[in-house]
Amino acid sequence: MGLSPAAVLIFLLLGVSQTYAAFSCKDQSGNDVDWFAVYKMPIEKDDGSVTGLAGGVAWYYVDVNKKGTLTPSAKTLDDNDQAIAYTLQQYYDKQNDKTIFHVMYNDEPWGSKSTSGIKLEEILSNRVYSNYTHEDDSTSTAFGHTKGTIFFDGTSGVWLVHSVPLFPNPTKYEYPVSGHDYGQTMLCMTFKYAQLKSIGTQLFFNRPNIYSSNLPTNMAADNADLAKAIAGQYQKGQPFQSVIELETMAGYSFTNFAKSKEFNADLYDTLVAPTLKTDLVVETWRRGSEIPLDCKLTYHANDALSIHVGSTTAFSYTKDHSKMAHSADMTKPWVCIGDINRMTSQYVRGGGTTCISSSFLWKAYSVIATQNNCA
């Protein structure tokens, strides 16, 4: 027996509602996109290359739909009508909905200091809040050196990996002053709900510093490691690392690397490079306890010395707070964006990176102009 017109209408309305409720990364026009990547510029003298350069809110954008180079954004990070704001606004619109899972974590969490006037240099020089210059302090080493935001309904969700201190605000979109001075990176990925279990495992290894979260009971039952991570539990003992494959909504494969604080080694030299079977060129924050090149390794990591994105004037690694890497071999076109640094002090911190094999993204992120090397 066929459905009545009223029943058909109800099913159609339900379908519309479910489509509307599903979460996705958003592009620069506010449309769904499977994944995108960002390179934010440090404060530089305005050279006309990208809007907001002198104010520290200029950035370049690339996504899987356009498969091009890093494109200068006409909108600044302070604007509400750009990809990052559009993406996070989905959560903000539903922040009071207790059926929605979310977690925001940051080794320099929002609210640890006022975001109205604090600059990153002030964070780095303050013993109480610094996770960079006083790595032996208990408040620094207890949690992973990891930053991100995740939100899911029962259908799909978003994982935004980034390097920005004091970001994001848990109730509304705003880009913090702490993110102005230095370069930063971000990676947004859209996943089906089934991938949340694996993501939760990686958080369990990382032990993130969580400052906002809600985990519905039914989702907690599906995702045991996630529930433990939200509750403040973390991986103890072996194994000290976890490497997983994540499949995005559109079927793209990302490899996520997570280490616990007991890993006690560099993530890139010890885990990422040998797993991907390629040398890496890495850009991270490096101050005071840099890792020497280990040229005896089969696959090793070189460090960036200068970065040149688009037509923006090249800048030194000392002006960059990004956490990114790409393979040295373009025939193995890996790009990684994450949240942990190449510093010996980070050996005892949880953290990780997320990598994809993509020729167009490799070309887009081949922005490291000079590097140290074993020659």
Curated annotation (Swiss-Prot):
Gene Ontology annotations for the cellular component aspect, listed alphabetically: lysosome; nucleus
Glycosylation sites: 131
EC class of the enzyme, as a word: hydrolase
Reaction(s) this enzyme catalyzes, per UniProt: Endonucleolytic cleavage to nucleoside 3'-phosphates and 3'-phosphooligonucleotide end-products
Keywords in alphabetical order: Apoptosis, Glycoprotein, Hydrolase, Signal
Biological processes, Gene Ontology terms: apoptotic DNA fragmentation; negative regulation of antimicrobial peptide production
A Pfam family that the UniProt record links to this protein: DNase_II
Entry EC no(s): 3.1.22.1
GO MF: deoxyribonuclease II activity
Signal peptide region: 1-21
Keyword Hydrolase listed: yes
Role this protein plays: Hydrolyzes DNA under acidic conditions with a preference for double-stranded DNA. Implicated in apoptosis.
Family as reported in the entry's similarity comment: Belongs to the DNase II family.
Protein name as it appears in the record: Deoxyribonuclease-2
Organism, as annotated: Caenorhabditis elegans
Organism lineage: Eukaryota, Metazoa, Ecdysozoa, Nematoda, Chromadorea
